[in-house]
Regions:
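Substrate-binding groove of N-acetylhexosamine-processing glycoside hydrolases
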Residues: 176-179, 313, 340-519
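An acidic-aromatic substrate-binding cleft motif
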Residues: 155-208, 213-233, 404-407
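Flexible loop/turn segments at secondary-structure boundaries
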Residues: 56-57, 98-99, 140-141, 197-200, ...
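Bacterial Sec-dependent N-terminal signal peptides
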Residues: 1-29
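Gly/Pro-rich turn-and-neighbor structural signature
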Residues: 79-81, 166-172, 234-235, 241-252, ...
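Contiguous, structured surface segment used for ligand recognition
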Residues: 23-182
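Hydrophobic or amphipathic alpha-helical targeting/insertion segments
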Residues: 95-97, 123, 127-165, 241-267, ...
Length: 519
């Protein structure tokens, strides 16, 4: 009887208001702590409240948090849209979309000055015995929810790497107030590429293809890594046409979609190959009408979603525009971009300068840029590595104040003549830190997109790049071993973290020296 009473008391003792300067890794406890908020324990779990006015992605993230709490403690947390009364509820909401949070803000019980109006920021604190996760925007709230999931012991890689969850009888959130500011790199994401036969075969067997069932897991992984951007698989796939639910799911969950460097106007290359006879030759100089019509359909289809539109034009597929000198191709490219922006303005009903766009300075396109080709100031310049993990240029000083900013397209997977580098991780963490730090320090900080091939076996470099993109200042050159140990501890075993980190470090180092697939 005494034991049962103690168990009930432990999970009804909510923490007293307080503010600490830092929450850190120890903000979740696995044993009772006076003044702490009890998430779950001994057959009980706090309800998670999401307002009906909030984003669907917030509700989906809350459902996952409830499931994660169940994985850790054995007791799943329910999600409710009913307005919470009393104490003991996790209230997750976006400023302006959660009645209870907005009410407490007006009453001065929550100070949101540190996150209000900021990009992807969140705070966590208690109010009147409830745990509040308040986001500045949709992804701010979602990141706050998944941040708590990670802290209770659920790895972002729980699905794609089968990372087990360590069980605990109770979960507590320590007293204090935690504020997470905006990321240093605005858009952070991956490109699923060179995906056949490995990822494509698995996705077809497991889900029936690259459909919304498959992408739900990919989007969740990205959000758990605090990433927000993606180029979808495209070798034999059309993201919007293979499953019409794909685009809506991405927008609901909070993922900004784009298309690769040779797929303009939100049209996967497969869209064109299926319509080659209808559209006509992929030659703007001779088939402007057919290609413009193709572009219009892409703009109309994606206009209701959060997207970054790739503009420009290369050849039919991942090749250079053919049939002329650089100067002649540059003249055609100028007409292409002018036409694309006219289409965007017409379809969206506003100045194209207000529509996020990027121009990829990739392979032969960099020659055009070096020869003086310019795009409007509001268009992001996406610089690229040399396909082997070395950036080709740091941010040019003359571009550092451009309105559209600068981004980086980087390969940790490569498929192209004369060599492939696809199925073995050959990228070391120190090299990644060096190259991305060069980009960041030179002002290339608006978007980082990484070609990750089949996703597996590139878990480690993906994890590092996404975390580094959030705050490059947090991992210094002499701290990469610390990161590796932390990664090993989270995804394998604390008892063996040092040994695992050493093995993984040497494995990638030896592979970098020889590039086994290239031999």
């Amino acid at each position: 009887m005494k034991s049962n009473f103690l168990k009930i008391w432990v999970c009804t003792f909510f923490f007293v208001e307080g503010i600490v300067s830092a929450w850190g890794a120890g903000h979740v406890a696995f044993s009772p702590l006076r003044g702490a908020f009890c998430l779950a324990g001994h057959g009980r779990a706090a309800t998670i409240h999401v307002d009906t006015a909030d984003y669907k992605g917030v509700y989906l993230a809350a459902l996952n948090l409830g499931t994660d709490i169940g994985k850790v403690t054995g007791t799943k947390a329910d999600v409710s849209t009913a307005l919470p009364m009393g104490q003991g509820t996790v209230i997750a909401g976006t400023l302006g979309r959660n009645r209870r949070i907005d009410e407490w803000v007006k009453q001065g019980k929550i100070d949101v000055s540190a996150i209000e109006g900021k990009w992807e920021s969140f705070l966590v604190q208690t109010v009147e015995g409830n745990l509040v996760i308040a986001g500045s925007d949709k992804r701010g709230t979602i990141f706050g929810i998944y941040d708590l999931s990670e802290k209770i012991g659920v790895s972002p890689w729980h699905y794609f790497a089968d990372v087990p969850v360590q069980r605990h009888e109770v979960l507590f959130v320590n007293p204090g107030r935690y504020v997470q500011g905006s990321p240093k790199v605005k858009y952070r994401g991956i490109f699923l590429n060179d995906e056949w036969p490995s990822l494509g075969g698995w996705a077809s067997t497991k889900f029936g293809g690259f459909n919304s069932r498959f992408y739900a897991h990919v989007f969740e992984l990205l959000l758990r890594l605090k990433a927000n951007y993606m180029w979808p698989a495209m070798w034999a796939s059309s993201f919007y046409e293979d499953d019409p639910a794909n685009g809506q799911l991405a927008d609901d969950m909070g993922i900004v979609m784009g298309t690769s460097h040779h797929e303009p106007m939100m049209r996967p290359h497969k869209d064109y190959t299926k319509r080659r006879k209808e559209v006509g030759p992929w030659d703007y100089a001779t088939n402007k009408e057919g290609i413009d019509s193709f572009f219009v359909e892409g703009a109309e289809r994606s206009r209701k979603y959060e997207s970054i539109v790739t503009i420009g034009m290369r050849g039919d597929g991942d090749v250079a525009m053919g049939g002329g000198t650089d100067e002649e191709n540059m003249a055609v490219l100028s007409d292409v971009i002018k036409g694309q922006r006219e289409i965007l303005g017409r379809v969206h009903g506003k100045d194209p300068a207000g529509i996020p766009q990027l121009w990829a300075v990739f392979t032969e396109v960099q020659r055009y840029y070096d020869k003086g080709f310019k795009v409007p100031d509001d268009v992001m310049l996406l610089f690229c590595d040399n396909n082997w993990g070395y950036i080709r240029r740091v941010g040019p000083w003359r571009e550092q104040r451009r309105k559209g900013g600068m981004g980086l397209y980087y390969h940790i997977d490569m498929n192209g003549g004369p060599w492939n580098d696809r199925w073995i991780n050959t990228t070391t963490i120190p090299k990644l830190r060096e190259q991305f730090n060069l980009a960041y320090q030179s002002g290339i900080d608006d978007l980082w997109i990484v070609n990750v091939g089949d996703l597996k076996p590139k878990e480690l470099p993906i994890d590092f790049i996404m975390r580094y993109a959030w705050n490059p200042d947090a991992i210094q050159a002499d701290e990469t071993d610390d990161y590796l140990r932390g990664w090993a501890r989270q995804n394998f075993s604390g008892a063996h973290a040092d040994a695992i980190a050493g093995i993984v470090s040497r494995y990638s180092q030896y592979n970098l020296w020889r590039k086994p697939e290239v031999q």
